[in-house]
């Protein structure tokens, strides 16, 4: 039998390769006609395909199945006035069936691995008292947000890609993007809180505690969920179902409505891509870079004055810091292609450029690779914890392999020893502080 780390590593490589193949398959297709929209599996939203008009059905000029020349607007047009839309892109407009199947397989793998990994992670932290500390509770909050997204969003988005028509009603049309944005918000804010927590743990040695959840961590988790839900409300308000004519068929499409009723929602629709890129991608990277730099400087400054008895405790803190950094790195790698595709379209796309079709084809490939990579982020955190953290690896082995009758009984000897070391280090540090206090007085 192959060792479990090898199997996890191979499964992870297979998932990433599948995401790339899905993007390559998407490259072999061109764009659907104006008015058609494509579902974004794993993002909980619909994206208007890159056509020459933003409102579905407004013009048939970009439909390759229509006449070769653009239609003249009703009432004709005056001489000397150029047409409103450039010539259409040539090529087929069908989505490759192979891409649909590959995307479905990737979504099913994410669904299965995500449910198993995140539910196991929650069970480990809930059952094992040694794992109930501030950073792990934040990781549990992150896993719970991913689990909600996996259970609700991924099946619906997969069905949406295969069926094209939206059959679930207005309520689900608003709920799916709301949960998706709330889940990403929980992930982003949890990673920020973990990075700040690692710096505070190094900078304030009086905060050393063995087992238990600090009150401030509980307040942080409540704030993270409340802020994430509030920031996701515009998605529920703005998304709606519209009816579009597509080759003689009326399709119900769930998307961010092109015409919003309020000035705020119109501004949100206009600035959405930049808002998502800045808050949901750049913020956790900037926070992590800032506080990990401060943490490194603090550890180098205090290195000479640290007591040898605290070495085991410092090793545990370095492992936690390495784990948090790994989670942030995985998040950045998974979400970079999708955000890069959207930003490139906003900054470089010109509908009057004669080479726009090739550029849109490249963006479409990048977009679909990004969609699958973003979905992968919902299931990859437990795998990353297993590969990086020895403590989580032991707990995952005990919980998944079922070596004993119950989780409490099968807790490894190494975990018990780590708990004893944790308490002993705290006691040793208290004695160290007391001796310094009396010696200074």
Swiss-Prot record:
It is a multi-pass membrane protein. One of its GO terms (molecular function) is endothelin receptor activity. Residues 30-87 are annotated as: Disordered. The chain crosses the membrane at residues 101-125, 137-162, 175-196, 218-242, 271-295, 324-349, 362-388. Residues 27-100, 163-174, 243-270, 350-361 are extracellular. The keyword Disulfide bond applies. Keywords: Cell membrane, Disulfide bond, G-protein coupled receptor, Lipoprotein, Membrane, Palmitate, Phosphoprotein, Receptor, Signal, Transducer, Transmembrane, Transmembrane helix. Residues 126-136, 197-217, 296-323, 389-441 are cytoplasmic. It is not sure whether phosphorylation is on Ser-434 or Ser-435. GO terms for biological process: aldosterone metabolic process; calcium ion transmembrane transport; calcium-mediated signaling; canonical Wnt signaling pathway; chordate pharynx development; developmental pigmentation; endothelin receptor signaling pathway; enteric nervous system development. The modification Phosphoserine is found at residues 304, 418, 434-435, 439-441. Residues 54-70 have a biased composition (Polar residues). It is found in: Cell membrane. The modification Phosphotyrosine is found at residue 438. This is Endothelin receptor type B.
């Amino acid at each position: 039998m192959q060792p479990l780390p090898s199997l996890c590593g191979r499964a992870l490589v297979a998932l990433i390769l599948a995401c790339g193949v899905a993007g390559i398959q998407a490259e072999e297709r061109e764009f659907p006609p104006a008015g058609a929209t494509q579902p974004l599996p794993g993002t909980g939203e619909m994206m208007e395909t890159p056509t020459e008009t933003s409102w579905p059905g407004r013009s048939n000029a970009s439909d390759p199945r229509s006449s070769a020349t653009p239609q003249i607007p009703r009432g004709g047009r005056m001489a000397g006035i150029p047409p409103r839309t450039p010539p259409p892109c040539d090529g087929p407009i069908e989505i490759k069936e192979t891409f649909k199947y590959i995307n479905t397989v990737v979504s099913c793998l994410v669904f299965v691995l995500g449910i198993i990994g995140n539910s196991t992670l929650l069970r480990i932290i809930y059952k094992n008292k040694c794992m109930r500390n501030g950073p792990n509770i934040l990781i549990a909050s992150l896993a719970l947000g991913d689990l909600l997204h996996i259970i609700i969003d991924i099946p619906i988005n997969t069905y949406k890609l295969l069926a094209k028509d939206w059959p679930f009603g207005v309520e689900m049309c608003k709920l799916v993007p709301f949960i998706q944005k709330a889940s990403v918000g929980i992930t982003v804010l949890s990673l920020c809180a973990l990075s700040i927590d690692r710096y505070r743990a190094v900078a304030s040695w009086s905060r050393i505690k063995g087992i238990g959840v600090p009150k401030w961590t509980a307040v942080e988790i409540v704030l993270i969920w409340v802020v994430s839900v509030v920031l996701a409300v515009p998605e529920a308000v703005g998304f709606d179902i519209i009816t579009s004519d597509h080759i003689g068929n009326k399709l119900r499409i769930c998307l961010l409505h092109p015409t919003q009723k309020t000035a705020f929602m119109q501004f949100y629709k206009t600035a959405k891509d930049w808002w998502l890129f800045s808050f949901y991608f750049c913020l956790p990277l900037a926070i992590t870079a800032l506080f990990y730099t401060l943490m490194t400087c603090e550890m180098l400054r205090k290195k000479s004055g640290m007591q040898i008895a605290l070495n085991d405790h410092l090793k545990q803190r370095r492992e936690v810091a390495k784990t948090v950094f790994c989670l942030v790195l995985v998040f950045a790698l998974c979400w970079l292609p999708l955000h890069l595709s959207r930003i490139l379209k906003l900054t470089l796309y010109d509908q009057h450029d004669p080479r726009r079709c090739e550029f849109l084809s490249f963006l479409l490939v990048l977009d679909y690779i990004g969609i699958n990579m973003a979905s992968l982020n919902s299931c990859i955190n437990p795998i990353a914890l297993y590969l990086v953290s020895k403590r989580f690896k032991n707990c995952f082995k005990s919980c998944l392999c079922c070596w004993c009758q119950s989780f409490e009984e099968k807790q490894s000897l190494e975990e018990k020893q780590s708990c004893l070391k944790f308490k002993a280090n705290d006691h040793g540090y208290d004695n160290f502080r007391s001796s310094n206090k009396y010696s200074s007085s």
